[in-house]
Amino acid sequence: MWQVLRGWRKGWQSPRGALAWAVQGQPCPPCSRAVASVGKDEYTFVVVGAGSAGCVLASRLTEDPNHRVLLLEAGPKDLLMGSKRLQWKIHMPAALVSNLCDDKYNWYYHTEPQPGMDSRVLYWPRGRVWGGSSSLNAMVYIRGHAEDYNRWHREGAEGWDYAHCLPYFRKAQRHELGANMYRGGDGPLHVSRGKTNHPLHQAFLQAARQAGYPFTEDMNGFQQEGFGWMDMTVHQGKRWSTACAYLHPVLSRPNLRAEVQTLVSRVLFEGTRAVGVEYIKDGQRHKAYVSREVILSGGAINSPQLLMLSGVGNADDLRKLDIPVVCHLPGVGQNLQDHLEVYVQQACTQPITLHSAQKPLRKVCIGLEWLWSYTGDGATAHLETGGFIRSRPGVPHPDIQFHFLPSQVIDHGRKPTQQEAYQVHVGTMRATSVGWLKLRSANPRDHPVIHPNYLSTETDVEDFRQCVRLSREIFAQEALAPFRGKELQPGSHVQSDKEIDAFVRAKADSAYHPSCTCKMGRSSDPTAVVDAQTKVIGVENLRVVDASIMPSVVSGNLNAPTVMIAEKAADIIKGHPALEDKNVPVYKPQTLDTQR
């Protein structure tokens, strides 16, 4: 129930702000020139961004008592007076929409008008709080397909194939069903399996089987293809972000300093060697120096922005903004990839959806139960079933993802539901449309120019037609007949290719999976930003560790892969041998001659 106990919306636009409240390699902008300067401090590592990756790094790097780590976060803590209950908007799973409605914990980004989407400006929420987007997301734990990582290896991220990534997924994870060759059993990140007995979830899974798709016991295990119960980063009725998993348990370590509400104004360089960062906190300018490395973990928007503001990026673009060039690296901000999705919505003829949970008294009851015992409808995000299928014959592994919700979502949940309804979120996983982001100005507080270039290829347009048609086919099965009312979206009048294409352009939205803007690859690749060791190419003592370094977007949600990336990078940074497991089987369809 994406609306339960939703917060007050503070306004359509956020205060302009960039990551790491980012960096610039030149004098401070007018808004901060009056800031006083204070002294010098030195650390082994400075990690910029306490999000899905940064929290992992802070924990793993401080396991060595000889490593002194400074963790800088632009947003606030995810606790209020040390309490999760008092910060229920973050920790109550069903309240996830609260933080999509304002900018308190959210960068509140927007794209440029998209030519392929009727010139619409799309909303891109990103976490600005301890835990980053793992404190705002829908808590769906999906790793992607094994072939995604083998593709990374082929694309130049050597040593990032499935055999070398799976052990780090397991290392991070503590699955409630216990360990096996795919799952971890003793990691910090609690993962639970969807287990609702809601009749609409049960009917959806049955309808998928009736449509000819298999049931998969574990879409993160042997067989991704099919429909089944989702894994969730929910533990004992509470969101289990990377802040909960990795940061909270280590805050007492004497070799970790974690700062919040901190605007990093630039990475400090001596020549091409990163030596520290400059940041602003409480109206004062500080410099933190490193004996080893600065690590950027701000995500796919903030990390490239931080690099460009620091003079690392396309030299021509930097000079236009009078930013001194440290290193010409034209791939920074390029290769932007995201998952687009549409909602196919059906009216429900029975009063069993989450529509009633929007009523004020019901909201209060749900909230009180959760505050008292962490149970009830507030203890889940309700996206507990879903699936992965191949769009057509010849596709070797799933390229369409489904999330089912026994409710209706309008405008990212920022508008209340209208009626009893259910929906499937459906989208293609490996779009061919690729975008970019660039600096809007040399002011680190300005959001960058974000241009994802959605639906710019005919292949992507055709794939979304398939998404709509295949969703309708599942919704038309007998299992959903007792609940099926009229189709709300796209609507029964939308049938032809042209009509479906128009619907998709008018209604598709981001699935909140921006990635790939600091592409990992070979140093000989002119589009690469970091090498397979996560080091920024062309400079020294600087790494990027987050979803921005993915060479290509994976076939699924991005939080689990981002945690894996940070776990693997931590071993690389510490000089540990890479974990590897070559003997884990992965399902392959018996034939590619058919779509299912």
UniProtKB/Swiss-Prot annotation:
Pathway: Amine and polyamine biosynthesis; betaine biosynthesis via choline pathway; betaine aldehyde from choline (cytochrome c reductase route): step 1/1
Pfam families associated with the record: GMC_oxred_C, GMC_oxred_N
Entry's localization field: Mitochondrion inner membrane
Listed cofactors: FAD
GO BP of this protein: glycine betaine biosynthetic process from choline
GO molecular function, one term: choline dehydrogenase activity
Residues where FAD binds: 44-73
Top-level taxon of the source organism: Eukaryota
Cellular component GO terms, alphabetical: mitochondrial inner membrane; mitochondrion
PTM field: Acetylation of Lys-498 is observed in liver mitochondria from fasted mice but not from fed mice.
InterPro entries linked: BetA (IPR011533), FAD/NAD-bd_sf (IPR036188), GMC_OxRdtase (IPR012132), GMC_OxRdtase_N (IPR000172), GMC_OxRtase_C (IPR007867)
Residue numbers bearing the N6-acetyllysine modification: 486, 498, 582
Residues bearing the modification N6-succinyllysine: 438, 486, 498
Catalytic machinery residues: 513 (proton acceptor)
Phenotype upon loss of function: Decreased testicular betaine and increased choline and phosphatidylcholine concentrations. Only one of eleven males was able to reproduce, impaired fertility was due to diminished sperm motility.
EC number: 1.1.99.1
Transit peptide: 1-34
Catalytic function, reaction form: choline + A = betaine aldehyde + AH2
Keywords carried by this UniProt record: Acetylation, FAD, Flavoprotein, Membrane, Mitochondrion, Mitochondrion inner membrane, Oxidoreductase, Transit peptide
Similarity remark: Belongs to the GMC oxidoreductase family.
Protein name: Choline dehydrogenase, mitochondrial
Species of the source: Mus musculus (Mouse)
Gene: Chdh
